[in-house]
A protein has these predicted regions:
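Helix-loop-strand module that forms the ligand-binding subsite of alpha/beta enzymes
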Residues: 41-118
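N-terminal beta1-alpha1 ligand-phosphate binding loop
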Residues: 2-29
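Short helix-capping segments at alpha-helix termini
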Residues: 26-33, 82-84
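Residues at alpha-helix caps and immediate loop-helix transition turns in enzyme cores, especially N-
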Residues: 18, 69, 103, 133-136
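A short beta-strand-loop structural module common to alpha/beta enzyme folds
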Residues: 32-43
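Glycine-rich phosphate/pyrophosphate-binding loop and the adjoining helix
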Residues: 23, 27-29, 45, 117-150
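Short histidine/acidic/glycine/proline-rich micro-motifs that form metal-
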Residues: 10-13, 94-99, 124-130
Length: 150
């Protein structure tokens, strides 16, 4: 069975709502043969990454940067996972109250360094999430999970 790892930092109600929408898409009844594993960024390990076939990453934009929790996750897994996870599919969502472009640049720089393959349209949002944003997150989760279906 394929495994999708969702690594997230959800300190706010907005991030929690987006996370729940991503999970709803990834665990949709039409998705078969994919185990969805959820880990808070500070709890996710290199073993989690190595055992997964694809990744979804969620972070708030804090003062123009990704959350310290997600950065810590990347710092922890980078070298142990660098060679073993090349080419694996990933997607991401970012939420902030203002500019999120720095956060996206950081996340893409790290995932490029890992040689992960972006496999779904990212979701970036500012302000309170609306229905369109939540639907985009559901689509993100479903798309990544469907990518892993055998």
């Amino acid at each position: 069975m394929a495994r999708l790892l969702i690594v997230h930092h959800t300190p706010s109600p907005s991030m929690q709502a987006l996370f729940e929408a991503v999970v709803a898409g990834a665990t949709h009844p039409d998705i078969e043969g994919v185990e969805v594993v959820r880990r808070a960024a500070l709890a996710a390990t290199a073993t989690d990454v190595l055992e997964a076939d694809g990744y979804l990453l969620g972070t708030p934009a804090n003062l123009g940067s990704m959350s310290g929790a997600l950065k810590h996750f990347f710092d922890t897994i980078y070298y142990p996972c660098l060679d073993e996870t090349r080419g694996r599919p990933f997607g991401y969502w970012i939420h902030g109250n203002s500019d999120i472009s720095g956060t996206e640049r950081q996340l893409l720089a790290i995932t490029t360094g890992l040689a992960w393959a972006k496999a779904a349209e990212s979701v970036t949002a500012t302000g309170d999430p609306d229905r369109k944003t939540l639907e985009a997150c559901t689509e993100l989760g479903g798309t990544l999970a469907a990518t892993l279906m055998a």
